[in-house]
């Protein structure tokens, strides 16, 4: 069916629409912050009509929450969290969050900061952090670290800070050096073999 006047022709394959819209939200926010997030901007990025975006999500907040939930999967995947190996391999792929999924990383930090001002986003941010902490606990254990929830939270906070700094300063060598030091700390504390 041809697009009518005022409508964009969809470049999104059937069954991939929701994910394409969520990825478009991530891209729009990563590029211009939440202030740039509109139905029209998401529609233009995804190659669909803005009515379709509104139909799928209903409100701007629902769009942000859904994209925040979506963003956890790619963020965990790119960093290799949960892949078993030796402590020497642990967190080796974390710097990829700054290259392969930079938009996801930037999007998440934008939403996290916005949740300070907008309590309606806090639950989504809380769920995001809970997902990261759960993945970190499993990842530490898969690498032979005797970890509990508190240690997973501490280690995740350190990595999260490194990623935030890396996003702002683009100094991957600093991130890698700090991760090596964190491995040494885990080993010297007797928490890993």
Where are these regions (language model features)?
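Hydrophobic alpha-helical connector segments
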Residues: 66, 76-105, 151-155, 179
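Outer-membrane beta-barrel domain signature
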Residues: 72, 76-81, 133-140
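Short alpha-helical scaffolding segments that buttress acidic/His motifs in well-ordered protein cores
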Residues: 94, 108-112, 155, 159-162
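Helix-turn-helix
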Residues: 17-20, 24-62, 66
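Hydrophobic/aromatic-rich alpha-helical bundle segments in the mid-to-C-terminal region
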Residues: 121-122, 126, 141-193
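Hydrophobic/aromatic residues within well-ordered alpha-helical segments
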Residues: 17, 60, 67, 71, ...
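Amphipathic alpha-helical segments used for helix-helix packing
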Residues: 99-129
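N-terminal intrinsically disordered/low-complexity leader segments
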Residues: 1-16, 193
């Amino acid at each position: 069916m041809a697009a009518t006047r005022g409508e964009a022709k969809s470049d999104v394959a059937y069954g991939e629409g929701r994910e394409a819209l969520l990825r478009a939200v991530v891209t729009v926010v990563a590029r211009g912050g939440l202030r740039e997030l509109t139905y029209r901007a998401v529609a233009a990025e995804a190659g669909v009509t803005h009515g379709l975006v509104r139909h799928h999500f209903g409100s701007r907040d629902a769009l942000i929450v859904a994209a925040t939930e979506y963003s956890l999967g790619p963020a965990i995947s790119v960093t290799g969290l949960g892949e078993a190996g030796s402590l020497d391999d642990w967190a080796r792929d974390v710097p990829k969050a700054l290259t392969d999924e930079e938009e996801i990383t930037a999007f998440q930090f934008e939403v996290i900061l916005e949740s300070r001002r907008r309590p309606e986003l806090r639950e989504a941010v809380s769920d995001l952090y809970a997902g990261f902490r759960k993945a970190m606990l499993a990842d530490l254990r898969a690498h032979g670290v005797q970890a509990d929830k508190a240690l997973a939270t501490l280690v995740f906070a350190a990595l999260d800070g490194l990623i935030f700094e890396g996003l702002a300063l683009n100094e991957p060598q600093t991130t890698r050096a700090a991760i090596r030091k964190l491995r040494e700390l885990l080993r010297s504390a007797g928490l890993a073999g």
